[in-house]
Amino acid sequence: MLSFRLAASYLRRMPTTTLQDRSVIRLSGEDVRGFVQGLVTNDVGGALPVWAGLLTPQGKALFDFLVWADGDDLLIDCEATQAEALVRRLSLYRLRRPIKIAIDPALAVHWSKDGGEGVPDPRLPALGHRWIGPADEPAEGWREHRLSLGVAEGVDELGSDKTLWLEANADLLGGVSFTKGCYVGQENTARMNWRNKVNRRLFVLPDGRVERRSVDNPGDALIPQWMVAEQA
């Protein structure tokens, strides 16, 4: 893949959709992969991008994001309204490590429904392709497409310290590694997986059928096809 630092002129020749509700955080310095590896749900030691979460010690989602590599740096593709809070949270764990954590205003997240540019979204190929490049294009259609596939993200949809990571279908969307070792919130998340006990999950409901009450078995819930295949 092109280095993000060298991609600007190349990406300007592509038809792009910029996700203006996303921001890019750059982490640079000594062993940034090792630093992030000990915090987030997914394995950032191998091929990137991956989808991951930063959880409470009880295993509830605080932030969700995609992690990309840019040379020795890591880039976090996150919800724009939560970017500053995520920078502060990551900085709490930095201690005396020589690592810089900051929003990179020169970069933006781009998306294409039909592919061609970038890489497939690691959560679900049907979400289309995305990449990080210069911030210069308007956004179109991404949120509607994502929600039609039953993929939630951000505090407006997942809440903050409200949803357990596996309730957000992280195990079905590649958002957690059960082999990487410790991270914040790992104990409860691993226990739920080991017991095969996820009491609640996010589903797609038909238009106009949303009710503000709890139900045990939403019989007319539309289970996304990717979840049907995974559970079969």
Which sequence ranges carry the predicted segments?
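Glycine-rich, small/acidic residue-mixed loop/short-helix segments
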Residues: L166-V176, A190-A232
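Short, conserved charged micro-motifs
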Residues: D31-V36, A83-V87, A135-P138, R212, ...
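A structural boundary/capping signal
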Residues: F4, L11-R12, R143-E153, L222-Q231
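Acidic, low-complexity central loop/insert segments
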Residues: P15-R26, F63-A152
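Residue-level signal for inorganic ion chemistry
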Residues: G29, I76, G185
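A mid-sequence, solvent-exposed acidic-amphipathic segment
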Residues: A139-W194, N199
